[in-house]
Amino acid sequence: MPRRHRSLFAPAFLSLAFLFASNAWSQPAAAAPAATPKYRDPKLTIDERVADLLSRMTLEEKVDEICGGENRNLSLLDTTGAYRPDQARAVLQGLYNENSTVTPRQGAIIRNAVQRYLREKTPLGIPWLFMGEALHGFMSNGSTSFPQVLALASTWDPALVRRVFTAAGDEARSAGVGQVFTPVLDIARDPRWGRTEETYGEDPYLASRMGVAAVTGLQGDEFDINNHHVMATAKHFAVHGQPEGGTNTAPGNYSERIIRENFLVPFQAAVEEGHVGSVMASYNEIDGIPSHINHWLLDRVLRQEWGFGGYITSDGDGLQMLVQTHHVAANMAEAARLALATGVDFDLSDGSVYRTLIQQVKNGAVPESEVDRAAGRLLAAKFRLGLFEDPYVDPDYTEKITSGPEHRELAVEAAREAVVLLKNDKNLLPLDLSKLKTIAVIGPNAADVHVGGYAREPGHGVSILDGIRARVGSAAKVVYAEGCQITTAPQGWRGWLANNVKLADPKAQVPKIAAAVELARKADVAILVVGENESTNREAWGEYHLGDRDSLDLLGAQNDLVKAVVETGTPTVVFLINGRPLSINYVAEHVPAILEGWYLGQEGGTAAANVLFGDVNPGGKLPITFPHSVGDLPDFYNHKPSDDRTYEFSTRKPLFQFGYGLSYTTFQFDNLRLEPAQIETGGVTKARVDITNTGSREGDEVAELYLHQRVASVTQPVMRLIGFERVSLKPGEKRTVEFTITPRTLSMLNTDMHRVVEPGIFDIMVGPSSDNTKKVSLKVTDLNGQAGTPVAPRPKGSESGVVSNYDDLKVAANFGSWEVMTDSVMGGKSTATMEAVPGGANGSKGAMRVDGENVKGAGFLFAGAFYFPGGGMSQPADLSDKKNISFWAKGDGKTCRFLVFTETQGQNPTFRSFVATPEWKQYTFSFASLGTDGHDLSGLAFLGPAGLGKFEFFIDEVEIK
């Protein structure tokens, strides 16, 4: 997210912001009020507390809430160690400076001083929301640096990813940071783009699962974020991962269908499932409209359709770019008006754009209500984090956990799981140390710790060379040669910051290669550590600081080095350290064993040695395709059928396909079956496959589930990932892996851009990679003569508050109970009433009327009527002698939602949509289509629309028959 600076050294994290309340330093302290103000009462709702606090704030204070700060490296503390408010706008000394020696403990002490001053010396005592980076670990000196995001994606292990971000969030919060700008949920479909390393790869489903894991790891499971968690920020919204030409911030001009089916998927999951607290707009434009002023994107989709209730932040200098880059605003004041009206709540970086709002409100150019709305969302974030109750942290705890033993071991575990075995001819790997006398470790990436972008000096670091030496000990001789240089920039994380990077002098590499050849020739095995470094693939934020490439070949003299070593005849292993897939054609053809490590983080050397010598069996899978050359781009696996042509005199078959990864053992996939193999639209089936470890080593395999619809009203990808599970198996062990295929899984956007399930034949494919699967067919038949069965938004849980009880409501069903529910837990705000009214369907005497309003969204808006056949959600009814559920409905024309809860499905009910038309209409759903046999029916729910606004509908003659 760094800003586009004009100075020689100015990456944006230097101005990572902090929320300001201007009264902290512009007004004298006031006497304590006689009564505790409402905003100080934790028993009140967040909305009530925000409203009270806003009523007490000046315009200047409210604008300060939505503006970032600037770091000029001035001290906040005087000689006595006390906080100096006169320097507050300079932020924190060195906390984000590349030359800083500030430790997390020192940062915690400084932030405590800031919070104490604000709490004790300012009239309103509004706490500071400190923000930071945690792309793959809290970005601070001494913190734990976990594997880069692309490496984490290679684990195909969301549970592990959640643990990583739980640790990262705890380290950040312990240092006083309340919000981090992660996860990156961009879909990387052009590896020329330097920020590919920051992503979870090219697939929307994989990115969504990893993204939700990251969000819940950072924030925890509860809406209120405790003092071991931080608020997450989903970025960059949206269409940032496939820029024109692969250059950072370039346009993302794709159709709404492509955007919804690919780029928006992980963001929707982060909002609806993870309840992410913040979303960051992206630099790029979509169809001529920059994301920062894109009403369709930020309002219609994010807030109205998905019910997002958090706050939207700009990217660093994103608002300035409206004037200086996109030229859609004549000046900063106009940029502020446009962005605020669109729904951007926070001006990241120095806040200079939104500070123009003070005068604009006074002049009548901007309604103060728009400032209130944005400031209120920032204040709500502080309340959600509990900062008004306790803004302080314990520096001793900070010191204890930061890069402590538990987090270091987790970093090793994550790095081990991330390694992908790409090739292993004649089982060269794992290396048998008993047969080796001399091991040559060669390459420009061997001796340094490469952690990837958005990192600082980790608390501990192990290079691959050091890891091998530690593992080998005295069992063999380990010799080292650099082989060649890639660039003249500093190695490791400092290279990510370097400006005006130059490739190393080719002539100077000749003697280095010669020296490496001499070592390789005398060794029993050569381990070549090549690829990229942090200065060659990274975020490009200025002409002096680039990171995108027009070639994916190994840079500099690395291919010459590899060729020279291979030609010695010494068995050779290539270990790749890089942040994007590379066109390693010579390596793939001539080197017998290849491992992909990406940037493995601070413990990468230990993990690499574990894999090389067989202590750990590699089980990672590629989250992105390896092309032969940039001429093959785009080459993502889930392309459309018409994209099937190759090029003259060459092939477009990837070097390594999405989902690919070998093992030191072998696995067999058998007995793929569907139960049932035929369902109605809206139905549910199970896919099961048996996996057996047929080799002699324990190892991990990933069962990857893909789908293709043979005939549809809109062209479909040749295949798309819909499920996966990583399993560990001992030699000879067999396990059955099961996947549930739901209407949401089978759904598509039809010609009217409605999400539906169309009847037809679906190919269900399972295997160890996208190019190696077994296939069965699923037949989906029509339901009620509909061309396509609508699919409602995915469920988020049943956290609801009982508002009223209408057990005596008269309906056709003569058992159970009715209750009205609203979302009162998950951060949204919904109201609903239910009553019996005269004039039902088919001349009946009465019906049930439900009306309500979704006035604030945060995840799932859960407002409507619940019917409990057994008398309550925890009292399921056995209705297995019944076949169907039917009801009559009418209303105001909005699309409402029908849910079926069963004890088996738990918090994952089956969803259907129904349109509450002005005239009565009957809907009938079979138990089979709802994925149940009726033996454990807990509840039926009739809910209003997912978006914000008022609704009204009527239900009558609900029958289970």
Predicted regions and their residues:
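Bacterial N-terminal signal peptides
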Residues: 11-23
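Hydrophobic residues in beta-strands and at strand termini
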Residues: 674, 691, 707, 729, ...
